[in-house]
């Protein structure tokens, strides 16, 4: 029995920490027209997409807090007592922050307020929050949240490197911390330079609803970083079933073969991205919602180096085809090793799947189950030397599974 109780305590403690990192709060002070605090005022916070309601009431000093709310919106907030009623429409909450309200009740009919003019989100330290509108409007050509968060001048993405690492206030990407719905996705062994534990972003771009970047959060729940903390929150289903599909394609046939009359040497390459999202309400189950996001990336990058006469974009003047074949034959005859032929290019693949279920149990409790899966590989050179043999390249794969 004690073991069972301890298990439940551990679960609730972890859920408490999780909710603080990835959800939002609404807090405030209720007063009448004379400035006196109003105790016992009812507070109703309704998440409009699902009509899920969270309730609270102000204490004897007029203060109230509604915790563990899903970030985003829109929300409708109603504060009511014998002194009057006030409604806030189109309220949007920021991940990891608390919305602060100063509610003044008047003895008149219901007052409807514009939330954006009288509310503010309070975060624990310097931070930036990007909502769904920011994510959808960003020119994310690589389908990566780096293309969103780089709008903050304190973040720099190194476009000169293929891995596109992002630096917070000039620090190495390995000093950052990344979480998705409270799941830590850090590069624990420091094998990558892009700030991720995988070769590409380990979750679907279309699955993200909000991203926050916190540079110096003064909160004990944060740790394991020295630069910044990136918190991403995934989308959820609603009462309306909706989805989307995308397909992107580019290859060498879409590139010009000459420039100002001079012919260009173009090696074959191809890149394809496609995926879908689907979200809605689970049929015949009250207050249960689902969201699924899938994304796949296939790529073939040409290797542009070769011997003289190979037709590659960059031919080594010191290496002829005869020398290339002689080196290969010596390796086979003397050392019993075949270094392979001329490398033509390197394929890569990346598959992402995210499934999420939200269950609104009551006006005080909400359950969330998230599965995130990422699998892929890339062909990469063994070191920075620029040879042309196939044996110099190897397959570097990764597989990531998270469930909570």
Name every feature range the model reports, one short phrase each:
Residues 242, 267-377, 398-404:
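Transmembrane beta-barrel wall of Gram-negative outer-membrane proteins
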Residues 19-112, 121:
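Periplasm-facing N-terminal accessory domains of Gram-negative outer-membrane beta-barrel systems
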Residues 255-261, 303-309, 348, 380-388:
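Outer-membrane beta-barrel translocator domains and adjoining extracellular loop/strand segments
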Residues 196-197, 260-264, 339-343, 388-395, ...:
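Extracellular loop and loop/strand-boundary signature of outer-membrane beta-barrel proteins
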Residues 116, 214-216, 246-250, 293-297, ...:
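Outer-membrane beta-barrel pore domains and translocons
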Residues 1-4:
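Positively charged n-region of N-terminal signal peptides that target proteins for export
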Residues 59, 83-85, 89-100, 112-236, ...:
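Periplasmic N-terminal accessory/gating domains of Gram-negative outer-membrane beta-barrel systems
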């Amino acid at each position: 029995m004690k073991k069972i109780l301890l298990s439940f305590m551990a679960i609730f403690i972890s859920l408490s920490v999780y909710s603080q990192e990835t959800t939002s709060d609404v807090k405030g002070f209720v007063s009448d027209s004379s400035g006196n605090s109003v105790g016992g005022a009812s507070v109703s916070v309704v998440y409009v997409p699902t009509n899920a309601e969270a309730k609270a009431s102000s204490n004897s000093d007029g203060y109230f807090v509604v915790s563990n709310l899903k970030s985003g919106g829109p929300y409708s907030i109603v504060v009511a007592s014998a002194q009057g009623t006030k409604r806030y429409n189109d309220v949007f909450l920021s991940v990891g922050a608390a919305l602060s309200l100063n509610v003044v009740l008047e003895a008149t009919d219901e007052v409807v307020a514009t939330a954006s003019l009288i509310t503010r989100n309070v975060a624990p330290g310097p931070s930036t929050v990007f909502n769904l509108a920011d994510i959808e409007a960003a020119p994310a050509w690589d389908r990566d949240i780096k293309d969103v968060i780089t709008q903050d001048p304190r973040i720099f993405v190194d476009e000169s490197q293929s891995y596109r690492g992002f630096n917070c206030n000039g620090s190495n990407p390995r000093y950052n911390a990344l979480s998705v719905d409270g799941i830590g996705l850090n590069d624990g062994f420091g094998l990558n330079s892009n700030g991720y534990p995988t070769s590409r972003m380990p979750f679907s771009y279309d699955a993200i609803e909000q991203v926050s970047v916190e540079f110096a959060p003064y909160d004990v729940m944060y740790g394991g970083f020295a630069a910044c903390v990136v918190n991403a929150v995934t989308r959820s289903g609603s009462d309306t079933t909706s989805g989307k599909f995308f397909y992107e394609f580019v290859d060498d046939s879409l590139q010009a073969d000459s420039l100002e009359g001079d012919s260009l040497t173009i090696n074959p390459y191809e890149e394809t991205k496609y995926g879908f999202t689907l979200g809605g309400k689970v049929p015949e189950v009250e207050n249960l919602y689902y969201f699924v996001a899938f994304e796949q990336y296939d790529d073939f990058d040409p290797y542009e180096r070769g011997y003289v006469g190979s037709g590659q974009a960059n031919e080594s003047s010191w290496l002829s085809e005869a020398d290339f074949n002689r080196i290969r034959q010596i390796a086979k005859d003397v050392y019993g090793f075949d270094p392979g032929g001329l490398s033509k290019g390197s394929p890569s693949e990346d598959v992402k799947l995210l499934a999420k279920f939200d269950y609104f149990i009551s006006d005080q409790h909400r359950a969330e189950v998230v599965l995130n899966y990422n699998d892929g590989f890339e062909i990469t050179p063994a070191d920075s030397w620029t040879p042309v043999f196939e044996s110099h390249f190897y397959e570097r794969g990764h597989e990531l599974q998270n469930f909570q």
